Structures are given as structure tokens and as C-alpha cells.
């Protein structure tokens, strides 16, 4: 898979936001946390991930390119907050009260667990499954688990086990 090139100006905007929010946190908390490593290798529909032990933030390059400033304003502080909470409080729920406090009171950003970016360009292929009451689209990962007999999925409405609907060939 070839990686997307993130323009230097966009990388610099990410780093400006990261450094500004980190400075706010260090001043507010009386700490001197180092700058986390940033990479642009996040895949799928996730906008970003925080790697706690390695103090690293992984950002989705496609969603960054498609949503530039809103992405920087929301996702960079969101992932930074995870790292700071881990350093400050240890292992706590990922979007718990400590994380919300870090987002709103320290980083001064509204605490939102999920992004609202369009994901059609990064959504993976889905497979059709059916129950008694409706059709379901399973991701390739879930489909493969069903095919290998490792998992089964049930409808939340009727409780019936989902059955794969094979595509008809002519």
C-alpha cells in the first residue's frame, strides 16, 4: 500500500496545534511532558489513535487531507488528551471523566468521543448478511471471522444469527 503524502504546510499545522495544546497542558498540570511522536499511518475509519506506552499519535492521512482544519482542531487534541491522561492518571477508561476533564478544562476543546467526518473514501468493503427482519453489512474482518468459524453475529432487533447472503452469479 502506498502512503499518501501530507503537504508540509499541513504537517506544520498539525505540529503547531500539538505544541500549543501540549504547552497548555504542561502549564496547567505543572509538568514537562515531552512532545509525542506523530505519524500518518492510521487506516480505516478511525481518525487517530494514541499509543500510550510509546507516547505516539497515529493520524489518518486521508481524513486529515479531506477535513484539514476541523481534523486538526478536534483529532489532535483528542489523541493528545489520551496520552496526557495516561501519564497523569495511569490506566483509566479511555473516554472517562479524566479524559473529559483533560479535553475541556486543560486543552480547552469540547470533549467528543467520535468524529463526524465523512468516511466513504476510507470505508472498507462490506458483506451482506441477513436475519429474519433486515439486511446487515459486515466488515471484511467480521466476515472473515464468520467464514473461519471464529465468530457469529446476531441481530440486535430479532436476535437471530446472521446468515451470509452470497452474491448471485449469472
Curated annotation (Swiss-Prot):
Subcellular location per the Swiss-Prot or TrEMBL entry: Cytoplasm
Catalytic center residues: 79
Biological processes annotated in GO: response to stress
Cofactor remark from the record: Binds 1 zinc ion.
One family name in Pfam for this protein: SprT-like
UniProt key word Metal-binding: yes
GO cellular component, one term: cytoplasm
InterPro entries: SprT-like_domain, SprT_Zn_ribbon, Uncharacterised_SprT
Binding site for Zn(2+): 78, 82
Needed cofactors: Zn(2+)
Domain SprT-like: 23-165
UniProt keyword annotations, A-Z: Cytoplasm, Metal-binding, Zinc
GO MF entry, a single one: zinc ion binding
NCBIfam families to which the protein is assigned, alphabetical: PRK04860.1
Family to which the UniProt record says this protein belongs: Belongs to the SprT family.
Name listed for the protein in its UniProt record: Protein SprT
Species of provenance: Yersinia enterocolitica serotype O:8 / biotype 1B (strain NCTC 13174 / 8081)
Top-level taxonomy: Bacteria, Pseudomonadati, Pseudomonadota, Gammaproteobacteria, Enterobacterales
The encoding gene: sprT
Amino acid at each position: 500500500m502506498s502512503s499518501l503524502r501530507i503537504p508540509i504546510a499541513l504537517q506544520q499545522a498539525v505540529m503547531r496545534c500539538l505544541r500549543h495544546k501540549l504547552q497548555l497542558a504542561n502549564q496547567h498540570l505543572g509538568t514537562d511532558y515531552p512532545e509525542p511522536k506523530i505519524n500518518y499511518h492510521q487506516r480505516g475509519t478511525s481518525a487517530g489513535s494514541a499509543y500510550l506506552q510509546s507516547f505516539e499519535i497515529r493520524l489518518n492521512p486521508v481524513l486529515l487531507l479531506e477535513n484539514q482544519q476541523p481534523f486538526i482542531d478536534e483529532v489532535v487534541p483528542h489523541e493528545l488528551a489520551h496520552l496526557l491522561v495516561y501519564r497523569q492518571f495511569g490506566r483509566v477508561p479511555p473516554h472517562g471523566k479524566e479524559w473529559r476533564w483533560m479535553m475541556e478544562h486543560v486543552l480547552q476543546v469540547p470533549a467528543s468521543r467520535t468524529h463526524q467526518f465523512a468516511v466513504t473514501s476510507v470505508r472498507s468493503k462490506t458483506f451482506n448478511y441477513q436475519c429474519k427482519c433486515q439486511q446487515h453489512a459486515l466488515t471484511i474482518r467480521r466476515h472473515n471471522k464468520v467464514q473461519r468459524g471464529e465468530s457469529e453475529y446476531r441481530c440486535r432487533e430479532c436476535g437471530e444469527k446472521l446468515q451470509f447472503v452470497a452474491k448471485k452469479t449469472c
